[in-house]
C-alpha cells in the first residue's frame, strides 16, 4: 500500500497590470487567481513505500485600498515533510510588493509593482530571467576604452552586451551592498548574461517603478575583454516611524477594487481622493479577523520597530519573514503575508492569507487515475478526518498527516492523497482534495512452508517432505461500510490435513452505533479451531525430554471494541470454547506423561483438564483495556504501552468452572537523549522497562496456568522451563544502542511464581523438576526481523545463542 500527502508548494505570485503614479501614490488593478498542477519527481523511502510527488503553483489574488497598502508577492518553497508510509507534504507562499509613499494621504504609503516587476516577486524567485532574454550566447564587444563609465543611454541599441558582474551601491549608506543582502537577488539580470540596451532599460524601469527605491540608476563600466560591469545605485524608500503592529487575516474577505486617480484632478481633489482611500482601508481592516500570530511574536515585531526607527523596505522584509516563518514552523504551510498597510500612520498592518478551508472534496480514482464512483460510503472517510481539515478551519500540515494515518488505518485503499489547492471561487482560501484508490473487495492468498520429517534411520526422504501453509481469503468493505468477512485455514501438511487443521472465520462490523455517530465501536464475531503445544508440560534443567501435550481449542467468540482515542481502546465480549488435550499420538489424554527412571512412560502426570476427562467446555466473559502512547523517533520506538485483561468464568461448562483470571502488563520505552528527527537521522538510545503480572482466583485448568520462560517471557529458557503457576511476576530491563542500520542491546530479566506453583492441580512445576523462578542476562543484535542474542540462565549457569523472530516487547 502506498499512502501519501502530495508534497505541494503553494507558490503565489501577484500579477498586476501597469500602474500609474501621481504625487507618490500608486493605483493597481486587481489580479486574477490561477492554479496550475505540475508533477515533480520525488522519492522517499523513510521505512515506507515511495510517494507520488506533485507541485501546486498558484496565483493568489490580493488587493486592498490602493493608497494605503504594501503588496507582497512571491513564492516560498516549503515542502511537506515525508514519513513512514504516510508521506505528508505541503508548501507555503510568501509575499512581495512594490509601491510608493504619500505625504498627503494620511494613512497612505505602500508599495506596488507594475508590469509583473515587483521587488518581492524578484527576491523570492531568484531563478527568474527576463522573458525575452536571448538564448544565444553570442555577444558584441563595447569597442570602448577600458575602465570608463558608460551611461545606459550611451549604449548602442544594435549590440548585445555581456554583463561580467553586477554591483549594488546604497547611496544612503554610501557603501556597497553585502553579498548576503537580499537586494542582490531582486534583479533579474545575471552575471555572465547577454542583454540588449532595451532589456537593460526595461530592467531599470522595472526597478524604478517597483516602489522599492526613492531613486535608482544604472551605469556600466567597460572591461578590457569587451564586457561590461554593471553598477546599480539606489536610495531605499523610507516611511514614518511606527510603534504599533497589527496582524489580520484577510483570506476570506472580498477583495476591494482600487479606483484609479484622474491625472487631471486638482490638488484639493487629490487630497480628498486620498482621504477616501484611507477611510475605505480603515473600514476594511476593522472588519478583518485577527490572525493566529501569538502575542510573543507581536511583541518581537514591536521590538524590531522600536529598534529600527523609521520603517524601511528591509524592515518590512524582516517582519514578513518572521511572520511567515512562525506560520510554517507551526504547520500552516499555505499561509502567506500578502500586504502591509497603514504605512506613515505609526502603525504597520500586516495582512495574512492563512489558508482558510472553504471546501472538502473526496474523489475515488480507478487504476488509470480517472475519477469514478467509489464503493466506500463518504461518511466512512469523513469520520476519519480531523476537524482541523474541515471547512471553517485553517489548513495545517499536521492535520493532513493525521488524515493520512486515520484513512490508512481503514485498510481500504491502495493509495491516498491529501492535496490542498486554491479555491478559485473564493480568493485566498483552500480546497482540500482527498483522492483515494480502493483495494479490490475480494482477495485470496496462499502462503506455503515445507517441513522435513526424518524417515527410517533418521535420514529424510523425498516422501518425508510435508507441504504446509495457510490459505486466507477476505471480502472487505461490504456495503461500502468497511464491514468484512475473513477466513483462514492452516495446516502443516496439506496432504494429511486432518492431523492439525486449524481455521478461523471472522465477521467485523464497525460503526456499531451508526456511521454518523461519533462513538467508535466495532463488533467482531468469529469461530475458530487451533492447536498449540502446551508449555505447562515441560521439563526443568537436567530433565529428559517430557512427552508433549497438545491443546486443541474450538469455539466461538463475540466481542465489541470501543476506541476511546487513537491511543486507548476497550474490548469486551463472550467466549465459548471446547478444549481437548491430546498426546503425541493424537489420542485424547486426561493426564500428562512423564518418563520413569527405567525409560518407561507413565501416564499418571498432572491432570490436563479441569474435568479430568481430557475434554473441557466452558464459557467466560473477557475484557481488556489497552493504552498505547508509543511513537517512532527515527525508526526507534519510544513512549509507553499498558494493558489490563480480565477473564471471568460464568460457572457454565464442565464442572461448572468459576474463576477470575487477570493480567497487567506495563512497558516503558525511555528515550535517553534528544536527537534531531528526520529521514536519515540517527535514532536515540532507549531504555526499556517491562513488568508483567498474572493471577487467577478460583478454578484453574492446567492449560490456562501462567508459564515462565521462553522468548516472550524470561529469555534464555525454553517455553515454560521455569515453571507453571497460578500467579507470576516478570521483570525485565533492556538498553538499546543504535549502530548503523540497526541496534545492539543488553538485557536482564527475572521471573517468579510467587510461591503459587503448588496451587496448580498436580503441581506440574515440581513433577517436572522446575525451579519456579529464574533469571537471565545477555546481549543481542537486531538483524531485520530476526533477533540474534546470547543469553545466560542462572538456573543452569549455561549460555546459548538464540535466533528469534519479532520483538520481545
Curated annotation (Swiss-Prot):
The tissues where this chain's protein is expressed are given as: Mostly expressed in young leaves, also present in old leaves, roots and stems (at protein level).
State the family it belongs to.
Belongs to the TOC75 family.
Keyword Transport in annotation? yes
User: Assembly and interactions?
Assistant: Part of the TOC core complex that includes a protein for the specific recognition of transit peptides surrounded by a ring composed of four proteins forming translocation channels, and four to five GTP-binding proteins providing energy. This core complex can interact with components of the TIC complex to form a larger import complex. Chloroplastic protein precursors such as prSS (precursor of the RuBisCO small subunit) also interact with these complexes. TOC75 interacts with OEP14, TOC34/OEP34, TOC86/OEP86, TIC55, TIC110/IEP110 and CLPC.
Its UniProt domain note says: Transmembrane regions consist mainly of membrane-spanning sided beta-sheets, which are not predicted by sequence analysis tools.
The segments annotated as topological domain Cytoplasmic are: 153-160, 235-247, 366-410, 437-442, 474-500, 562-569, 694-705, 784-797
Q: Show the taxonomic lineage.
A: Eukaryota, Viridiplantae, Streptophyta, Embryophyta, Tracheophyta
Q: Which UniProt keywords apply?
A: Chloroplast, Membrane, Plastid, Plastid outer membrane, Protein transport, Transit peptide, Transmembrane, Transmembrane beta strand, Transport
**Stretch forming the signal peptide:** none
Q: Which residues lie on this side of the membrane: Chloroplast intermembrane?
A: 132-143, 170-225, 255-357, 419-427, 453-464, 510-553, 578-684, 715-776, 806-809
Q: What is the name of the protein in this document?
A: Protein TOC75, chloroplastic
Localisation per UniProt entry: Plastid, Chloroplast outer membrane
Annotated TM spans: 144-152, 161-169, 226-234, 248-254, 358-365, 411-418, 428-436, 443-452, 465-473, 501-509, 554-561, 570-577, 685-693, 706-714, 777-783, 798-805
Species of provenance: Pisum sativum
Once renumbered to this chain, the transit peptide range reads 1-35, 36-131
Any matching Pfam family? POTRA2_Toc75
